[in-house]
């Protein structure tokens, strides 16, 4: 339905429509390239006649600026390029299986709690 809605909004010249699509290169079962490579999303969306632009999802000012992009007569799709372990490098070793995090042991849970809280400069969660 997403593609149909996009196609219809282009067909009808709907330009008060904009959406943010998270592009984090992963699916539940692993990396997009391993599970189901979807190709160049920006090129596909633009080929429908919409305007797709890429921005750094971790840069709030870039996200705000993207919303102002001229897209008269067509919808705007903001492709927010994100890292699922941004600000939590301890999780990087689990990439691309980060859709959910299961701890292998109580020791790993405690280690992750401490490392992530240190990196984020917050107090660890007390269990």
Listing of model-derived features with the role each one plays in the protein:
Residues 1-72:
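Thiamine diphosphate
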Residues 60, 64-127:
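Glycine/aspartate-rich loop-and-adjacent alpha/beta segment that forms the canonical ThDP
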């Amino acid at each position: 339905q997403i593609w149909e809605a996009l196609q219809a909004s282009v067909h009808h010249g709907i330009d008060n429509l904009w959406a943010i699509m998270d592009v984090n290169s992963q699916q539940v079962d692993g990396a997009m390239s391993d599970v189901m490579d979807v190709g160049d999303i920006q090129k596909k969306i633009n080929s429908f006649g919409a305007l797709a632009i890429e921005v750094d999802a971790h840069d709030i000012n870039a996200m705000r600026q993207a919303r102002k992009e001229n897209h008269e007569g067509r919808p705007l799709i903001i492709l927010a390029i994100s890292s699922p372990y941004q600000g939590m490098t301890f999780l990087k070793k689990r990439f691309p299986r980060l859709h959910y995090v299961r701890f292998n042991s109580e020791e790993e849970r405690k280690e992750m709690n401490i490392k992530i809280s240190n990196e984020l400069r917050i107090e660890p969660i007390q269990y």
